[in-house]
Amino acid sequence: MKARTFALLAAVAPAAFAQAPQIQFDSAPEPLKLPDGMYFGELTGVAVNSKGHVFALSRGNTSGPAYAAAATQLLEFDQTGKFIREIGKNLYAWSYGHTVRIDPQDNIWVTDKGSDMVVKFSPRGRVLMVFGRKQEASDRETGPLERHKPPLAPEVGRFRQVTDVAWDPQGNTYISDGYINSRVAKVDKLGNWLKSFGEPGSGAGQLNTPHSIAADAKGNLYVADRGNRRIQVFDGEGNVLREIRIDVPFPPDAKPALGATPNVEKMQAAGLPLTMAPGAPWAVCITPGPNQVLFTSDAYPGRVYKLSLEGKVLGWLGESGKQLKQFGWIHEIACPSEKQIWVAELLNWRVQKLTLK
């Protein structure tokens, strides 16, 4: 979308705001309570299981050199926010955590962008299954610090900067892969590779950093195609069903959480990913139950959006900032209900529990 389109939207803001109302909400101060001497780093993920336990994925246990340090920590809290345990301490797959999800059986899944791996834990915290392979420390040719232009061709079973997971009613797992391969992989409930779909690009079915993924009750997949500033909806075989774009006006003086105000026209002219553009989806989450809705977020102007599964914006909330009820790059959303969501923030090193009115 061209910058002039954003200008036009701003010009008709009063009418457009009426079509996409602002949602009133509250945020509980410090909903997760860490023990003395333990600290969060960047919060990259948050998930909630059937008992109401909250799982936070933090880049808080940094080890190694300042550059390319390992930083992944998976922490569990009970429904009151009391710390229970750390899961997978010193796990081989830990490098640079990306997202955490809970499947219908309360198994815990973590994607790690740095190690190119996906790990499935049991509810007790035991490793059940691993996907992908971490590069060998001595492997300079394909190691994590090397950037190939063009990137290496995708391989069956190998991920490159993997981002997220989702499941369909048949128990198949879908893995968004990711910053490099720009595709979605499908594996069955036994872990067998079935197929992949998507490739780098901006056309229908092509992807530019599939950053987050969620599935509805029918097994349709909602992929946060962040670099293309859209959500693409696929069926379980990878056929494109529709495209969702978020074009909600925002104040002209809206401040970014970090860096300069994004210039969409310049980004497009340079062929850059639209990661920081208004409406570019960083996270997607679909509520359970018979009447499902979709929540997503952008980095600028820093909002959460509530949508129907067909793509209608039902409302929005929040803005960029460092105070309670403001957001600093929401990286993942957990939505156990339509009225309660959890957001994990990179820049503010925190999780917020939001109650929508």
Protein language model features and the residues they cover:
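Bacterial N-terminal signal peptides that target proteins for export
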Residues: M1-A7
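Bacterial N-terminal signal peptides
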Residues: A7-A16
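Eukaryotic scaffold repeat domains enriched in small/polar residues
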Residues: Q19-K357
